[in-house]
Amino acid sequence: MTQEEYILIGKVLGVWGISGGLKIGVLTDFPERFDAGNELLVGRKLYTISQTNWQKAQVIVHLSGIDDIDTALELKDALVEIPASALKELPEGVYYDFQLIGLEVVDLSGVKIGQIKEILHMPSNDIYVSSYGVKEALIPAIKDVVKEINLKTGKIIIDPIPGLLD
């Protein structure tokens, strides 16, 4: 497996306690990835989760082989990843963020608007942040605007609502 085939699911924010717990900022919609017994790559090294404790949007994990604060401190700011082969299959029309970032955004007539740079997860709907000249376009991920997402062609076709690109 090449290094490009790993998917980011979190980042080590700090240590928790003297027994080597790691406080991880979670970047996945599947919190069960952090259940005890699962394997994670932390700093590109494979570990097994021995214990988990949730605290709001963060999780405290204890990993096999990390049992003191000094060893845990070496992993501060490390990326937490899983192999791409461990990704859950999503329903049709639902995508992982990494699949959308970098896609070209075009309007109904094929005119290039920009490229997806970021996805903002808002309560009502996601917002696709696209480059747009020297500015950014904030594209609501709703059916009235986003007409097609085609991973094979690498394009998102939109029908901009009035004012969207002003």
UniProtKB/Swiss-Prot annotation:
Record's InterPro entries? Answer: PRC_barrel-like_sf (IPR011033), PRC_RimM (IPR056792), RimM (IPR011961), RimM_N (IPR002676), RimM_N_sf (IPR036976), Transl_B-barrel_sf (IPR009000)
Any Pfam family: RimM
The record's GO molecular-function terms, alphabetically, read: ribosome binding
Q: Which residues form the PRC barrel domain?
A: 92-164
Question: Domain of life here?
Answer: Bacteria
- In which compartments does the protein localize? Cytoplasm
The entry assigns this protein to a family as follows:
Belongs to the RimM family.
Q: Name one GO biological process term.
A: ribosomal small subunit biogenesis
Protein name per the record: Ribosome maturation factor RimM
